[in-house]
Amino acid sequence: MGKQNSKLKPEVLEDLKQNTEFTDAEIQEWYKGFLKDCPSGHLSVEEFKKIYGNFFPYGDASKFAEHVFRTFDANGDGTIDFREFLCALSVTSRGKLEQKLKWAFSMYDLDGNGYISRQEMLEIVTAIYKMVGSVMKMPEDESTPEKRTDKIFRQMDRNKDGKLSLEEFIEGAKSDPSIVRLLQCDPQSH
């Protein structure tokens, strides 16, 4: 029984090849690993937080992981299946900049209304600061989540309406690579 489970059905494999940037072999490899970590075939938010936390040993990644989980959980059923996992992984790891930015926008847009409010940005940025802990040295104008949020809004909120549209978000990020760094909070880019 366990044997047949470790192979994806041909139609699922074909669907994933069409909708991700992964090869047959990579998809099969990811599937094996996914089943090893999630024998049920579904990942709960608690399991996801545990796995995600392993990547950030010096901080608390649980809040940020919840936001990532919500964005991965495309159908909103409270679990991540292999298809949702691989599609999100494809965008975040191999997607073009615009795809990554759309994905990030959907994570920051907590209420799904098509805009990122200052409060939504602050919530995500605060979660990022908790996650990276004391590992990253921030410039003075980014030393707190509030300061970083203000800086992002100053640079992105073109029409000064106190919220970011998808267009403002994408244009702002494309015109200023430092914003992408601000959004990602990637320790490697410092």
UniProtKB/Swiss-Prot annotation:
It comes from the Eukaryota. Disruption phenotype: Viable. Adults exhibit reduced night-time sleep but daytime sleep appears normal. RNAi-mediated knockdown in the whole organism or simultaneously knockdown in the C01 and A05 neurons, results in a similar phenotype to the genetic knockout. Residues 40-58, 60-95, 96-131, 144-179 form the EF-hand domain. Ca(2+) 1 binds at residues 73, 75, 77, 79, 84. A lipid is attached at residue 2 (N-myristoyl glycine). The lineage of its organism: Eukaryota, Metazoa, Ecdysozoa, Arthropoda, Hexapoda. Keywords: Calcium, Lipoprotein, Metal-binding, Myristate, Repeat. This is Neurocalcin homolog. Ca(2+) 2 binds at residues 109, 111, 113, 115, 120. Pfam families: EF-hand_1, EF-hand_7. Expressed in neuronal tissues. High level expression seen in the cortical regions of the central brain and lower levels in the lamina, the first optic lobe of the brain. It is also found in the thoracic ganglia. CDD domains: EFh. The gene is Nca. Ca(2+) 3 binds at residues 157, 159, 161, 163, 168. Belongs to the recoverin family. One of its GO terms (biological process) is regulation of signal transduction. Calcium-binding protein that is essential for promoting night-time sleep and inhibiting nocturnal hyperactivity. During the night-time it promotes sleep by limiting synaptic output from arousal- and wake-promoting neurons within the C01- and A05- domains that include the mushroom body, and the antennal mechanosensory and motor center. Regulated by the circadian clock network and light-sensing circuits that include the CRY photoreceptor; it is likely that both of these internal and external cues are required to define the temporal window (the night-time) during which this protein functions. It comes from Drosophila melanogaster (Fruit fly). One of its GO terms (molecular function) is calcium ion binding. SUPFAM superfamilies: EF-hand (SSF47473). SMART domains: EFh. PROSITE patterns: EF_HAND_1, EF_HAND_2.
